[in-house]
C-alpha cells in the first residue's frame, strides 16, 4: 500500500525546504499532496517563487488518511502555519495517532505550539530553539529523528530531511538507493 504524505505550505515558506523533500518523497513513489494552508490555489515562497498546490486545506476531510504530515520552514511561512488553528489540530491528531510529523528550519515552532516537542529531542534553525518546548534540543545534528517526530535545521539539509522521511515511512533501502542515485556520497569529500 502506497504511503500518503500531507505537505502543507503557506506564503513565505522556504522553497528549498519544500521542493527538495517533495522531490525525494516522489522519487520514492510516496503519494504526496502539496496543500495550501491558506486555502489558496498557489502560494508565494520566501524568495518570491510561485508554488501551485495540489489541494487546499479545506479539501482535507480526514487528516488521518495520511501517513505523515510535513511542513517546510522559512519566514513568515512558519509563523503563518503556527497561527493556523487547523494546522495545529492536524499536527496534534497525527502525532496522537503515532503518525509521522516532520518540520524543518523555523517550522518546529508549529510542533511546539501543538505540544509535540515537550518530550522529544529536536533541532531547528539556529535561534529558534528559544521558541521550542523541547527538553532535549540538539544543535549539533542536521536532522533529528525521535520516534514519530522528525526535525531538521534548515535549507542546506533539506535533502537529508527528505531522506529521513522516506526512510521512516518505507523502512527499506529506498532512501539509500535515492541517496546513491542523487550522488549524495560525492558531497562527503567536497564540503
Locations of regions flagged by a protein language model:
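Active-site-adjacent pocket-lining segments in enzyme domains
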Residues: 4-8, 13-16, 27-36, 55, ...
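N-terminal beta-loop-helix "entrance" segment that forms/cooperates
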Residues: 35-54
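Histidine-anchored nucleotide/phosphate-binding helix
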Residues: 22
Amino acid at each position: 500500500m502506497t504511503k500518503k504524505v500531507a505537505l502543507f505550505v503557506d506564503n513565505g515558506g522556504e522553497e528549498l525546504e519544500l521542493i527538495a523533500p517533495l522531490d525525494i518523497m516522489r522519487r520514492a513513489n510516496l503519494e504526496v499532496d502539496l496543500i495550501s494552508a491558506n486555502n489558496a490555489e498557489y502560494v508565494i515562497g520566501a524568495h518570491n517563487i510561485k508554488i501551485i498546490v495540489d489541494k487546499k486545506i479545506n479539501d482535507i476531510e480526514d487528516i488521518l488518511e495520511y501517513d505523515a504530515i510535513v511542513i517546510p520552514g522559512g519566514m513568515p511561512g512558519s509563523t503563518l502555519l503556527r497561527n493556523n488553528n487547523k494546522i495545529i489540530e492536524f499536527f496534534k491528531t497525527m502525532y496522537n495517532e503515532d503518525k509521522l510529523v516532520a518540520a524543518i528550519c523555523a517550522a518546529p515552532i508549529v510542533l511546539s505550539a501543538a505540544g509535540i516537542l515537550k518530550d522529544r529531542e529536536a533541532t531547528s534553525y539556529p535561534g529558534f530553539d528559544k521558541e521550542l518546548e523541547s527538553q532535549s534540543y540538539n544543535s549539533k545534528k542536521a536532522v533529528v529523528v525521535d520516534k514519530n517526530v522528525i526535525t531538521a535545521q534548515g535549507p542546506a539539509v533539506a535533502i537529508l530531511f527528505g531522506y529521513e522521511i522516506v526512510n521512516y515511512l518505507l523502512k527499506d533501502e529506498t532512501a539509500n538507493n535515492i541517496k546513491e542515485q542523487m550522488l549524495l556520497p560525492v558531497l562527503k569529500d567536497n564540503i
